[in-house]
Amino acid sequence: MSRRVVVTGIGVVAPGGIGAARFWDLLAGGRTATRRISLFDPARLRSQIAAECDFDPSAHGLDDETVRRCDRYVQFALVATAEAVRDAGLDTTREDPWRMGAVLGTAVGGTTRLEHDYVLVSEGGSRWDVDHRRAEPHLHRAFAPSTLASTVAETFGAQGPVQTVSTGCTSGLDAVGYAYHAIAEGRADVCLAGASDSPISPITMACFDAIKATSPSNDDPEHASRPFDARRNGFVMGEGGAVLVLEELEHARARGADVYCELAGYATFGNAHHMTGLTREGLEMARAIDTALDMARLDGTDIDYVNAHGSGTQQNDRHETAAVKRSLGEHAYRTPMSSIKSMVGHSLGAIGSIEVVACVLALAHQVVPPTANYETPDPECDLDYVPREARERELRSVLSVGSGFGGFQSAVVLTGPERRLR
């Protein structure tokens, strides 16, 4: 693939920071956005905490009709895409619509709207013979995962590759990766790529409660998410969305766009092992890392920072540490590796794209965001996890990795423009 892909715009809706500037302030300051859930009464849940977005759709330009027909996760994506397009200085009306794509990821789609409408049509969940007359006319559009990509495409005029990606917690990374391939292989010149999820709802929270994946530290929410720490006890649910404008390099140059960085490599593999279990050796994640590095024509020793999946579960953090050491060798011990989930929670399908935006900003600022709440070392997690405080560092190439229920293992490599765009 000879066509090179660059990032020219970013947009983000995240807990504690809507807009790239506020999002970066949160990360650089090492602050956490976890609080007791306010979107519904969580009293009957094991985990009653989450990282919510302080989100008013009308304050971000969404009209009443859009709010009625779109679930919260689609609203996040529309706001993030609008910011990314503005940031890129991209006039979508002047682009060839057949050469502009929209690839968006989600893990749970419109679960919140589906829950809400089920209560309406079933007399509060008491009847199976539902009353269809009570269903909202926008229900299908609101909950169907396909709506995410189609709504962004419709709003911004993209008629090229339009796709919703749903690969669990790697959906955001994979959406960015699939958009990368669409441009690199010549099927598009521009792609709006990212992901969005709003999983802080009773049924989704209950799903993760049932398998004890989420943290029960309800009495100390700000310190509940502690990836790689020996006392970690599960992840904190989050929500949000992030979108990047990806362009073919010469297309970006022709319109005089500023370039953040190059998306230089991407790979994804499955472990064919278990729905939630991970192999201790991290072979599949290591293979994704190695393949993404090969695509970027880089070696493990070229990586200056690893943005970890770092969910804060016991098995994930061991698995990921092993994978990074397998791929980077001794260089892993000299490479900072941090998890922003410690600050913004785990927004399932959205987090991969949110983390890619964090990597873009890390390259732009030459700063590594910290792992908040990391205090007690785990002998099996023995790398440099950037405890509690951001760190200035020369960054030229960064790696972002993700792991998803179902065995998905993905990796993206980003390089600063001064390294490769001469």
Curated annotation (Swiss-Prot):
It holds the Pfam family ketoacyl-synt. Keywords: Acyltransferase, Transferase. Residues 2-416 form the Ketosynthase family 3 (KS3) domain. One of its GO terms (molecular function) is 3-oxoacyl-[acyl-carrier-protein] synthase activity. The active site is at C169 (for beta-ketoacyl synthase activity), H309 (for beta-ketoacyl synthase activity), H346 (for beta-ketoacyl synthase activity). The keyword Transferase applies. It is an enzyme of class 2 (transferase). Its EC number is 2.3.1.-. Gene3D superfamilies: 3.40.47.10. The keyword Aminoacyl-tRNA synthetase does not apply. GO terms for biological process: fatty acid biosynthetic process. GO terms for cellular component: cytosol. Involved in developmentally regulated synthesis of a compound biosynthetically related to polyketide antibiotics which is essential for spore color in Streptomyces halstedii. Belongs to the thiolase-like superfamily. Beta-ketoacyl-ACP synthases family. This is Putative polyketide beta-ketoacyl synthase 1. It comes from Streptomyces halstedii.
